[in-house]
Amino acid sequence: MSEVSKWPAINPFHWGYNGTVSHIVGENGSIKLHLKDNKEQVDFDEFANKYVPTLKNGAQFKLSPYLFTGILQTLYLGAADFSKKFPVFYGREIVKFSDGGVCTADWLIDSWKKDYEFDQSTTSFDKKKFDKDEKATHPEGWPRLQPRTRYLKDNELEELREVDLPLVVILHGLAGGSHEPIIRSLAENLSRSGRFQVVVLNTRGCARSKITTRNLFTAYHTMDIREFLQREKQRHPDRKLYAVGCSFGATMLANYLGEEGDKSPLSAAATLCNPWDLLLSAIRMSQDWWSRTLFSKNIAQFLTRTVQVNMGELGVPNGSLPDHPPTVKNPSFYMFTPENLIKAKSFKSTREFDEVYTAPALGFPNAMEYYKAASSINRVDTIRVPTLVINSRDDPVVGPDQPYSIVEKNPRILYCRTDLGGHLAYLDKDNNSWATKAIAEFFTKFDELVV
């Protein structure tokens, strides 16, 4: 593990709104990508320099002058009204897995803008017609959905399954889902060219979905990603698959990529603001006043609410013990007792949550040992898919101490370090995200040019 920087997340060297992209490439260079038309081979970093100008080494970008630190960028992303920004429509599918559990997949459906008479200038649409369709498709007992999201009809789902465009799967962060502004921004940018089919895979219990088995997601929870990608590959063996993870979703994606190695069906991947070293991030969140005060408690309380609303399925009596020795591969979720839920409501950090719930379920003695083992930095060297990595030096959640020395050893990773951007934000004066545009540009050029 790297040492924690002595600099606070806010410091004079990281103030400003003119950002710069820097490539972190190891001494062995980058993997060579094979281009379609001229049969040329080009290094991964040179591919970005030549074909993805937004991510060119030394490229500059301009953020909002009013959001001149990572703290302000991140706070604004979480607190401002983005209800009229990134107005995408989602059709929801309940995805069933081999262990009996479910999650939800929200498919971006651009054609619904026409069907529901969407007005781009006002973001208004035929809500009466939409609500009628939503009511007709909503499963009994399931939570009310976010705006512009409804369950798919059977015939609509069948039509989606016939689409054979390249697919981009988006994985959201720890306290989020498809409704998050940054996820909507990413989905909108990816779909704009019409080149991709886009879906957000909501983790179990997130984005107003239900948990149906006593199994809550962790950093090790890669099985749903694996099964979903395998399902999509089986349906259309010849189409390309891509994935992008944001924050904790980036951790799960990087862990999946490292576990799968050469077996992954993905053609390329991207991570945005991944806390590569969870232990380092946990220390940052506890030691840095801004991170501890403004972010850690909110995330812990979201996780607690997720447990609370799903106690019907997760709950066990007070005093419950594991029915088998818990391990990463065979966890035992015996900690979801009424007593622990009462305790959790006063948690002020994710570490407290993981100390009570996550670590015991996986057989770890404490949260810090869980963080140390579950960090995606442990699996970087076995990633075999070309992967774009974007992290910011002023990220108040991840901190400035990124694991360059380890990541740069893998030639399949293009590490784009930025000096500004905050956590998942990168907001410009119009509240658009530079990062989501950059990721969309990367996938578009990769799909267009690379074999």
Curated annotation (Swiss-Prot):
Q: What InterPro entries does the annotation carry?
A: AB_hydrolase_1, AB_hydrolase_4_CS, AB_hydrolase_4_sf, AB_hydrolase_fold, ABHD4
Record-listed cross-link Glycyl lysine isopeptide (Lys-Gly) (interchain with G-Cter in ubiquitin), residues: 114
Chain ranges of the AB hydrolase-1 domain: 166-430
Which residue positions are annotated as catalytic? 247, 395, 423
GO CC annotation: lipid droplet; mitochondrial outer membrane; mitochondrion
Q: Which UniProt keywords apply?
A: Acyltransferase, Hydrolase, Isopeptide bond, Serine esterase, Transferase, Ubl conjugation
Q: Name one GO biological process term.
A: medium-chain fatty acid catabolic process
Q: Give the E.C. number(s).
A: 2.3.1.84, 3.1.1.-
* Molecular function GO labels: acetylesterase activity; alcohol O-acetyltransferase activity; monoacylglycerol lipase activity; serine hydrolase activity; short-chain carboxylesterase activity
Q: Which domain of life is it from?
A: Eukaryota
Q: Which reaction does it catalyse?
A: an aliphatic alcohol + acetyl-CoA = an acetyl ester + CoA
Q: Which Pfam families match?
A: Abhydrolase_1 (PF00561)
Instruction: Name the SUPFAM superfamilies for this protein.
Output: alpha/beta-Hydrolases (SSF53474)
Q: What does this protein do?
A: Displays enzymatic activity both for medium-chain fatty acid (MCFA) ethyl ester synthesis and hydrolysis (esterase activity). MCFA are toxic for yeast and this enzyme could thus be involved in their detoxification by esterification.
Q: Which family is this sequence assigned to?
A: Belongs to the AB hydrolase superfamily. AB hydrolase 4 family.
Q: Any miscellaneous information on file?
A: Present with 2550 molecules/cell in log phase SD medium.
Give the protein name, as stated in the record. Answer: Medium-chain fatty acid ethyl ester synthase/esterase 2
User: From what organism does this protein derive?
Assistant: Saccharomyces cerevisiae (strain ATCC 204508 / S288c)
